Amino acid sequence: SLASFQSRKGTALDNFSYKAEAQVASNFKKLSLNAEYITYYAPNRRWTMRVFAGTFLSNNANDNYYDFNVSRVNDYLFQYDLYGRSEAEGFFSQQYIKAEGALRTTGNLTSANQWLMTAQSATTIWRWVEGYAEIGWVKSMHQNAETHWGTGITFNLVPDFFEVHFPIYNSNGTVFTNNAYPKNIRFQLSLRPASLAKLFSRSWF
């Protein structure tokens, strides 16, 4: 079963939103909270801050299917516009969904079966170019908590609708030195009516 509560306050230029969620199944119980603040401090210049925290009250699952995901959501409840659900490689496997941990890069940390906390911030550098920084703390059962952080550039072509993320440096080192760098590029694309509504409410400012 699923229970959730969400709220959004403010205007198109300065707003705060949050969502609290509880999931209960025969083999797990978990709680999560997601909060985001967005402000346009000058014409076409914005600053965003997002935090996520999730914990299992109990977890008897035999695999990681219901884990909190650090970067790529599993979306077993079909809540998001995830276009490559079964893809482990290729273009659609690099889709970025701003849900759960929502880090752009993760290294070897992919999910957490005990608790997960992440924080992300981004600000406009020039027009539709943003710089971002993010950090996450990942804890799975019988393992020590681990930390992963990263920085990069986002081409914010259409806010919350079409964005491309280019990691630059993270806790594993300089991403650009990796020959497989193109696989680290993430794209965000949403065709949901709610996203389109937010697009038109902001595009006039």
What do these predicted ranges mean?
Residues 127-129, 133-139:
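Long, low-hydrophobicity, solvent-exposed regions enriched in small/turn-prone and acidic residues
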